Amino acid sequence: MRKNTIDIITLGCSKNLVDSEKLMKQLEANGYKVTHDSDHPQGEIAVINTCGFIGDAKEESINMILEFCQAKEEGRLKKLYVMGCLSERYLKDLQMEIPQVDKFYGKFNWNELLADLGKAYHSEFAIERHLTTPKHYAYLKISEGCDRKCSYCAIPIITGKH
């Protein structure tokens, strides 16, 4: 376990990846060493950016959370934070069922994590990211949410209107 190191695990869509990259830039600006989707996480803190849209993605997110809860119980991790769509949609259920998580953040309030770590949000880096994709491309988040109300879709419930 490395001091001042945070492991960021991103699950789900490319919009989640953009959110993780923005968070990574903010954490680096606050002096943290950040790893992303490492096969061997070594940080003292982990942040899991979850997906809550389709069944398989929800299951993957919950399994990842439980895996890191076990690492925390074994003393390989000090703090565990969860953000993203899963915690946006199922916050109360997750808080009751997985108390090992130090705090859950929704899709839009992940910057509160900085305050909880005793760090500042750097507005000068508001649009900057720590890119995790190969140098020849990067994802661009154009919008968030959806105005449609399709009976089969949870996106407007999770992310709100466009």
Residue map of PLM features:
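Proteins enriched for Cys/Gly/acidic motifs involved in redox and nucleic-acid/cofactor modification
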Residues: M1-H162
